[in-house]
Design a protein with these regions (language model features):
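Extreme N-terminal starter segment of soluble prokaryotic enzymes
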Residues: 1-3
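Residue-level recognition of beta-strand termini and adjacent short loop/turns
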Residues: 9-11, 24
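Short glycine/threonine/proline-enriched tight-turn/helix- or strand-capping micro-motif at secondary-structure
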Residues: 11-19
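Glycine-rich beta-strand-centered segment in the early N-terminal region that forms part
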Residues: 21-37, 49-95, 114
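A structural motif shared across PLP-dependent enzymes of the aminotransferase-like
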Residues: 39, 94-105
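Cytochrome P450 core scaffold surrounding the K-helix E-X-X-R motif
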Residues: 39-46
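Short, compositionally biased
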Residues: 102-115
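Mid-domain Rossmann-like dinucleotide-binding core that forms the NAD(H)/NADP(H) cofactor-binding site
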Residues: 116-169
């Protein structure tokens, strides 16, 4: 039986069995190999450490059934209209901590076979940092201040370097 991590109440984490939804024509069923925990975001949600007027309060209520934001796995089954993925392919997905997922093919990214799945799992946080670098126009500035030394902050430093920023504080 598939399992997932949920936060039933503030400060509580459990592993529960759940039933997968039926596979639709453009869906893929994925067996998760690794999921990455964003310690800042997930701890904030778990401990309800946010103000009532924030996006966290609007988006996350208890029981919180969708913990986690990124995972990698392999395709176990495909719907009849799936075009670009096949059984056995390794994929990245922005999904919750769970042993299995059923999602649209369009919500998966194929991982090349020579990429280690543990490393590929970082793709989501790298994308978050990239979006910040893009929005901050790192390609046209010489100096940037990055506040935060978590995974996203560290990846923002790497993006700043890749964009050629000379002074990274």
């Amino acid at each position: 039986m598939p399992q997932r991590i949920i936060f039933p109440r503030k400060g509580e984490v459990i592993l529960e069995d759940f039933k997968l939804p039926s596979l639709q024509t453009q869906d893929v069923q994925i067996r998760t190999r690794y999921s990455l925990m964003s310690i800042g975001t997930e701890t904030t949600i778990l401990n309800q450490e946010y103000d009532a007027d924030t996006h966290f309060a609007q988006r996350f209520t208890f029981p919180q059934l969708k913990t986690g934001v990124q995972a990698v796995g392999y395709v176990e089954e495909i719907g009849p209209d799936v075009k670009d993925l096949k059984v056995g392919d390794h994929v990245f997905m922005r999904m919750a901590h769970g042993s299995h997922q059923v999602i649209a093919e369009s919500e998966c990214s194929l991982i090349p076979s020579d990429i280690d799945l543990k490393e590929a799992c970082w793709c989501g946080l790298a994308k978050t940092a990239f979006r910040a670098a893009w929005a901050g126009n790192f390609s046209s500035i010489n100096q940037v201040l990055i506040i935060g030394a978590g995974a996203v902050g560290q990846m923002a430093v790497r993006w700043a370097s890749a964009f050629g920023v000379e002074s990274i504080l």
